[in-house]
A protein has these predicted regions:
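Arg/Lys-rich, low-complexity, intrinsically disordered basic segments
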Residues: 1-110
Length: 110
């Protein structure tokens, strides 16, 4: 008997949870299914803090050759750093943009 390739997932399994990291040296973590990704080094600034566009562009230039910022990189710290910490001047606007850009749902737990 053949199994259907398209399995319906419960709505909660499609949600990515974003919250403060449980690691002392990281700012945030995302939970994607059974994988947890910690990102953003504590003690370092990011675009949501300094809001300096020139610094944001330097960050992008420095990291673009080694990071996967496409949806295929969704389970990497580099993906989340780029789209949450270095995308827009506020965390909430970055979350909204990331959801729209990649067609995902992010639940931010404060």
């Amino acid at each position: 008997m053949k199994r259907s390739k398209s399995r319906s997932l419960s709505p909660s399994s499609n949600v990515i949870t974003l919250k403060k990291s449980s690691k002392k040296d990281k700012k945030f973590m995302v939970i994607i299914g059974n994988k947890t990704v910690h990102f953003g080094a504590v003690g370092y600034s990011d675009f949501t803090i300094h809001k300096d566009i020139d610094r944001m562009h330097r960050y992008e230039t420095r990291h673009k050759s080694r990071e996967d910022w496409k949806k295929s990189g969704i389970k990497t710290a580099g993906f989340w750093s780029k789209w949450i910490l270095w995308n827009k001047p506020s965390l909430i606007s970055s979350i909204r943009d990331t959801q729209k850009r990649f067609g995902i749902r992010i639940k931010y737990v404060r």
